[in-house]
């Protein structure tokens, strides 16, 4: 049985890792062993932060909605506004509400009035 040398496969694998480490500082960009560790850690951060991004954007939307609601009515809080939306049967998610609050304040004001009417009733 002849000897099987894995040089091309190993070279391709190393090249893939070095390519992923492009732009890194020091030995992390051109030494396979160090680059592999750096790329693995970067992938861990990327996985974690894909989860955190959802959390961060939801918090941002809530802050924007709260600020816009308070600019329309000082006494109305975010939680009471959301309660008013539920009572009024308005099913709009926070992403759309935040976008309306920033780009179309008049339309958002109409939604705030509907929520207030539902709370008063």
From Swiss-Prot:
GO cellular component, one term: ribonucleoprotein complex
Keywords: Ribonucleoprotein, Ribosomal protein, RNA-binding, rRNA-binding
SUPFAM superfamilies tied to this protein: Ribosomal protein L20 (SSF74731)
S-S pairs: none
One of the GO BP terms on file: ribosomal large subunit assembly
InterPro entries assigned to the protein according to its UniProt record, in alphabetical order: Ribosomal_bL20 (IPR005813), RIBOSOMAL_L20_CS (IPR049946), Ribosomal_protein_bL20_C (IPR035566)
Gene3D superfamilies: 6.10.160.10, Ribosomal protein L20
Gene Ontology molecular function: rRNA binding; structural constituent of ribosome
Keyword RNA-binding: yes
Function in brief: Binds directly to 23S ribosomal RNA and is necessary for the in vitro assembly process of the 50S ribosomal subunit. It is not involved in the protein synthesizing functions of that subunit.
Family note: Belongs to the bacterial ribosomal protein bL20 family.
Protein name, as recorded: Large ribosomal subunit protein bL20
Organism: Ruegeria sp. (strain TM1040)
Gene name in the database record: rplT
């Amino acid at each position: 049985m002849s000897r099987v040398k894995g040089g091309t496969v190993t070279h391709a694998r190393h090249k893939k890792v070095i390519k992923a480490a492009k732009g890194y500082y020091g030995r992390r960009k051109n030494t396979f062993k160090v680059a592999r560790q750096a790329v693995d850690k970067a992938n861990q951060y990327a996985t974690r932060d894909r989860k955190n991004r959802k959390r961060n954007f939801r918090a941002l939307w809530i802050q924007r909605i709260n600020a816009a609601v308070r600019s329309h009515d000082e006494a109305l809080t975010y939680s009471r506004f959301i309660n008013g939306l539920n009572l009024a049967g308005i099913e709009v998610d926070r992403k759309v509400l935040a976008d309306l609050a920033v780009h179309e304040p008049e339309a958002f004001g109409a939604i705030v009035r509907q929520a207030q009417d539902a709370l008063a009733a």
